[in-house]
């Protein structure tokens, strides 16, 4: 299977799972487990084909480490964004106009949290999926699941 299609599928199902579990309240503690589990199975399904980045930040980190060819980076990122956007539209189509209880926007703390957790995700990926010390380790999927959950 084409590595760009794998990135599209992985990002699609990750965002689809997020959309179906957290858009409206009620999933509780199951939402992070569902999201992490969806990521885990997609990593196991596509890791051997594309590296299973499923996130442009992860692709950038893996490229900076020298484990992703420069020629693949734009294709990976386009596939990930297109997959995520299509999944978001499907969530909107299925759920209609969901009622999201949003508080007062607080941009700076949100950006700080996003940066820190994206850093943590990239850090885990670089240390469990791209390190020479863990070559042959096929258990990185559940480690990403735990970090993502």
Task: Give residue spans per PLM region.
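Membrane-interface helix-loop junctions and terminal tails of multi-pass membrane proteins
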Residues: 1-149
